[in-house]
Amino acid sequence: MDPMKAQQLAAELEVEMMADMYNRMTNACHRKCVPPHYKEAELSKGEAVCLDRCVAKYLDLHERLGRKLTELSVQDEEVMRKAAAGTG
């Protein structure tokens, strides 16, 4: 595959994954913090605080998972490299 096409595909996938994460975060935090039947157009202070905390936790967890997955990926690559060196 052409390196430019691969880079473009990777960028498109990253945008798609970020959009998916944003949509899931929005839905989860809205369900948790905003009652299904509300009377006012503006968020209450409690709802706004809940949403702030929910988003912060969601993003923190997303960052932690990303770091852990990267760490596991590096470990897997090392194991594969050692296995390939041992059989070669």
UniProtKB/Swiss-Prot annotation:
Keyword Translocase listed: no
Q: Which GO terms describe its molecular function?
A: metal ion binding
The Gene Ontology CC terms held by the record are: mitochondrial inner membrane
Subcellular location, principal:
mitochondrion
User: Matching InterPro entries, A to Z?
Assistant: Tim10-like, Tim10-like_dom_sf
The cysteines joined by S-S bonds are C29-C54, C33-C50
Query: Where in the cell does this protein reside?
Result: Mitochondrion inner membrane
One Pfam entry for this protein is zf-Tim10_DDP
Q: Which UniProt keywords apply?
A: Chaperone, Disulfide bond, Membrane, Metal-binding, Mitochondrion, Mitochondrion inner membrane, Protein transport, Translocation, Transport, Zinc
Please state the span of the N-terminal signal peptide per the UniProt entry. Answer: none
Query: What GO biological process terms are annotated to this protein in UniProt?
Result: protein insertion into mitochondrial inner membrane
Top-rank taxon: Eukaryota
Question: What is the recorded membrane topology of this protein?
Answer: Peripheral membrane protein
Family matches, as Gene3D superfamilies: Mitochondrial import inner membrane translocase subunit tim13 like domains
Its subunit composition reads: Heterohexamer; composed of 3 copies of TIMM9 and 3 copies of TIMM10/TIM10A, named soluble 70 kDa complex. The complex forms a 6-bladed alpha-propeller structure and associates with the TIMM22 component of the TIM22 complex. Interacts with multi-pass transmembrane proteins in transit.
Domain writeup: The twin CX3C motif contains 4 conserved Cys residues that form 2 disulfide bonds in the mitochondrial intermembrane space. However, during the transit of TIMM10 from cytoplasm into mitochondrion, the Cys residues probably coordinate zinc, thereby preventing folding and allowing its transfer across mitochondrial outer membrane.
Write out the function statement from the record.
Mitochondrial intermembrane chaperone that participates in the import and insertion of multi-pass transmembrane proteins into the mitochondrial inner membrane. May also be required for the transfer of beta-barrel precursors from the TOM complex to the sorting and assembly machinery (SAM complex) of the outer membrane. Acts as a chaperone-like protein that protects the hydrophobic precursors from aggregation and guide them through the mitochondrial intermembrane space.
Q: Which family does it belong to?
A: Belongs to the small Tim family.
In Swiss-Prot or TrEMBL terms, this protein is called: Mitochondrial import inner membrane translocase subunit Tim10
Q: Give the species.
A: Danio rerio (Zebrafish)
